[in-house]
Amino acid sequence: MTRSSPAQLSRFLSEIQNKPKKSLSQNFLVDQNIVKKIVATSEVIPQDWVLEIGPGFGALTEELIAAGAQVIAIEKDPMFAPSLEELPIRLEIIDACKYPLDQLQEYKTLGKGRVVANLPYHITTPLLTKLFLEAPDFWKTVTVMVQDEVARRIVAQPGGRDYGSLTIFLQFFADIHYAFKVSASCFYPKPQVQSAVIHMKVKETLPLSDEEIPVFFTLTRTAFQQRRKVLANTLKGLYPKEQVEQALKELGLLLNVRPEVLSLNDYLALFHKMQAG
C-alpha cells in the first residue's frame, strides 16, 4: 500500500494521535495517479538529485525514490520525521523559508538538480522567490503544485488581469508551462481552492548580471504597485517622469501605457534605458 493511500494516511494520523494543521497548509495528496503524473511531468530520471519541500507523509517522496532520484526533503512539522526517516532520503526538519540553500552545494558536483513539491500554499511566493534569488544556478527544472489562481498568475500574458510582478519574476528565470489542474478531491483534507501543477525549465543564461537583477525587480515591483495607473507615474519614485517618458518614446511605447501592457522583454529594454540615463 502506497503513502498516497487514504487508508495509510488515516492510520498514520491515528497512530500519532494528530491531525493536519491548517496553519501549515497541510493538504495531503491521496491520489496515486496524480502523484505519478507530477513525477512524470518533473522529468526526473535515475541519479537526479531532487529538493522536495513539504513532503508531509511522503506520498510524492516515495514516488520520486521509485523514479531513482536522490531526495533531499525539507519538512517543517516534526510529527512527520519518524515516518520520513524510514525512507532512503536526506531529511531536514526546518522551515523551508529559513533553510540555507547553499547547504546543497555538494550536490552540484552531480549536475543541476530539480525541485519537485506540493508546496504549502501560504508560503508559495516566498519559497519560489527564495529558490531563484538564492540559488538560480542550482536547478534544471522546478515542478510544483500551487493554488490554481497562483498558477494562472505565473503563466499569464501581458494585458490580462492575472499578469503582474510575480509573472515577470518567474518568467525571467524560467520557461513555464501550466501542466494540469488538480481537483480538491485528490487531497485530504480537501482544500477550499483548486490546485494546479506548473513545470518550469530554468534558463541556462540570464539577460542581467547578479548586480542588476535586484534593481530590475525593484522596477517591476514598483510598476505593479499601482497597476491601473500610467507607468510613468508609478515609477516616479524611482526615476524622473520625463526620463521614463523619453525611454518609452524611444522604445515605441505609448506615454500613457499601463504596467500590465509591457512584456518581460519590454521591461528589460526599459530597464536598460533607465540605467543608461
Curated annotation (Swiss-Prot):
CDD domains: AdoMet_MTases. Its EC number is 2.1.1.182. It catalyses: adenosine(1518)/adenosine(1519) in 16S rRNA + 4 S-adenosyl-L-methionine = N(6)-dimethyladenosine(1518)/N(6)-dimethyladenosine(1519) in 16S rRNA + 4 S-adenosyl-L-homocysteine + 4 H(+). It is found in: Cytoplasm. Its main location: cytoplasm. Keywords: Cytoplasm, Methyltransferase, RNA-binding, rRNA processing, S-adenosyl-L-methionine, Transferase. GO terms for molecular function: 16S rRNA (adenine(1518)-N(6)/adenine(1519)-N(6))-dimethyltransferase activity; RNA binding. Pfam families: RrnaAD. Belongs to the class I-like SAM-binding methyltransferase superfamily. rRNA adenine N(6)-methyltransferase family. RsmA subfamily. Specifically dimethylates two adjacent adenosines (A1518 and A1519) in the loop of a conserved hairpin near the 3'-end of 16S rRNA in the 30S particle. May play a critical role in biogenesis of 30S subunits. This is Ribosomal RNA small subunit methyltransferase A. It comes from Chlamydia pneumoniae (Chlamydophila pneumoniae). The gene is rsmA.
